[in-house]
Amino acid sequence: MGAKKAAAADRPRLRNLRGEGDRLRGEIIDAAIKVLAALGPEDPFSLRSVAKEAKIAAPSVYIHFSDRNVLLLAVLEKLFGEQIAIRAAAEAAAAKAGGGAWERLLARSIVSVLFGLKNPGHYKVLFEGRVVPRLNDPRIADFGRPLMVRSIELIRQIQTISGARRVSEDPQRLALLLWSSLHGIISLQINKPTLEWPKAVELAEQIARAIIRPERA
């Protein structure tokens, strides 16, 4: 029985019916994400490895993606889109509970940390992998820009409530400090799991409070 299942898993999938090209494209992107998430620091990434994961012939990948970089861009666009949706949902939940700008910013911060810790492979593709940074395409910055823009907007709202506006409290600078610190939580806990870390939610809130200082609002 196990041999039959293994053989079925290795067997190339049937060709999608006409009109299902978009679905196949999405499946190729999902396969690429799985391959990238499992790669070691020095492991190569190829379209053939993606085709194998998707259980399709390699030429089928080229129908939708002319080369590796085009596929990598599609991967980043999807993953950043998911990040935008996840953080927006967390913010909406905080707002529904009566939270103001600080509570919404904190909710976004916490969910980003929890996602990274629960999905280290995906997180590394976005922020730590060696394959993606070799891409030199301005669209990569565009994919993730809404995340930073929203953080800046919420920080500005917090500052408006408090009336505190000093050069050292530039919203963009604070947003970058917050992002860098949250990234540190995720990266260090992924790469140094044997250390006795505080709970991720508590650590994220403590760092966010130290940077944003919402008590002044």
Task: State where each predicted segment sits.
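Short amphipathic alpha-helical elements of helix-turn-helix/winged-helix folds
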Residues: 31-38, 115
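Hydrophobic/aromatic-rich alpha-helical bundle segments in the mid-to-C-terminal region
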Residues: 134-141, 145, 158-209
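N-terminal intrinsically disordered/low-complexity leader segments
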Residues: 1-23, 34, 91-94, 217
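Generic hydrophobic, amphipathic alpha-helix propensity
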Residues: 24-33, 50, 75-83, 151
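Hydrophobic alpha-helical connector segments
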Residues: 88-121, 171-178
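Helix-turn-helix
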Residues: 27, 38-70, 74
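Amphipathic alpha-helical linker/stalk segments
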Residues: 78-107, 138-141, 149, 157
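Short secondary-structure transition hinges
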Residues: 114-153, 194
